[in-house]
């Protein structure tokens, strides 16, 4: 199958899904364009800030779409292009987009609260506590990992085996561009908030700033060491995760969303221009080097089809910015389908290389393979290969930073909500509760632990990220299914995704526990394996406990309707 045919199939399926299935869900759940959203009802100028659809879409899209939809399909391609493509399209439409839409809808109908609050309101306090504790720890792990990855991407120096220190121009350019994005985003935030111009002028200004940042970044690379970047990045996150969303988060993600969209559009043009052939087998085997297609393929592709992290963004930050309930469809459902399109492009990219060709060209990481393929495609229409390769790499590297403060903000909110129940009197709290629910305290303790994890080695437990991420998806689907049932809305479309993701996640965790247990008995105690085993067991117990509570509520015979 050629790249063009794969692209056309994806465009038809994803576009048709938005127009048909997305609107079907909108009608079934009863979207009310006249209802007052939490962005207005709870407006505080910090987290609850109403924003235009394109701005919130930019935040949602830039937060959920980073390296994930590129890395996942390329790694999963060992099973062949057909199962990867089928899961991206089927999973993206019926699993990921439904989860993201349902998470945002449930949040908007509950004052913009997170999935943790939804669990408390419709399942129980114990489930809420377990979920929020898991979310908080998950966010600490992600912040630690992403901060280290970003610092590594920005690192201006590399030392060879002989001890010679060399400047890395590409990293310096990415660093300059990313820092300029932040500076420009602050200015754009004030411009969007206080200007009276229409959205087209605002868009033009955003694109001009985007181009300016890229040009200056390529022209004036900045060289800073890895350790210094760690400090700078955590200082930035500290400010960004408590700053009003209109001042940085909204405009920065708005800028980056255009960069991401331009990359996708350029890639689509490249595919149609080059019409790359597919050099991958349609299907290889259910077992590739000891990796079983079920559940590995579904855990590995993750963001390109369904990711639990998306539910945290949908219910944690984006839901607090929705101006009108009708905007939820393009912001949540639409952003997920756009991410699935990016995943299909990544699959076409890796399939365009013959066996061993990418490695022969020095393309060893997934982003490099993606950038190299797109550069090859666009060179057909005369665009310089080296320039396109640099720009694609720059774009992919910049997106990790966009997710950082969103994750930190969600972590902060999870920590605060852990100590706040729905019946808590926030005006008459104890001194202890006032401290632990303070946004600055919650942010500092979250980031201090993430920084320490960065230094002591998050890599010991990072292999569990895929399973932990999909466990979040299970819990989000359970919470949303119970919410829809308790409020007398149709939620059967969540049941199959919920059961399937339970099977995927619990199987993956079970296989991991079995493998690690055998390793401990054969090789003895090992810090990495021991930590992974402990966390895997805890994740499995947590998932089973919350899932059992949720399933009980789904089958509970109670005709009393809860309002939302």
Predicted region positions:
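Extracellular loop-to-transmembrane helix junctions
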Residues: 2-19, 76-107, 116, 175-181, ...
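Membrane-helix boundary/coupling elements in multi-pass transport proteins
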Residues: 67-74, 91-99, 103, 107-111, ...
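Extracellular/periplasmic helix-exit of transmembrane alpha-helices
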Residues: 271-285, 337-373, 406
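Juxtamembrane transmembrane-helix boundary signature
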Residues: 14-38, 60, 90-116, 193, ...
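Membrane-interface helix-loop-helix modules in multi-pass membrane proteins
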Residues: 51-110, 121-125, 142, 147-156, ...
